């Protein structure tokens, strides 16, 4: 999985803010707020080839069975793709 270039991430307590930077600010004027778990998924997306590998990373981090969170991880990935910050 690959993050789209032109964004910076700022962590504020238990949420992540994804902000456009550089030229991206001319195209996008939206700040994307992510929960702690969605932020973890976004920050670690490039370590995974697919949703299944990403689910495994989340499962290890939060000590949850992968089968319990697969659908949730898939939904977060789809949302990040629709927002244009993840391929």
Spell out what each predicted region is:
Residues 30-87:
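Long, charge-rich, low-complexity alpha-helical segments
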């Amino acid at each position: 999985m690959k993050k789209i270039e032109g964004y910076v991430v700022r962590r504020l307590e238990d949420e992540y803010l994804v902000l456009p930077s550089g030229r991206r600010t001319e195209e996008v004027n939206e700040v994307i707020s992510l929960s702690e778990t969605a932020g973890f998924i976004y920050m670690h997306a490039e370590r995974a080839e697919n949703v299944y590998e990403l689910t495994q990373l989340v499962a290890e981090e939060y000590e949850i069975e992968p089968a319990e969170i697969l659908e949730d991880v898939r939904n977060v990935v789809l949302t990040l793709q629709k927002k244009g910050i993840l391929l």
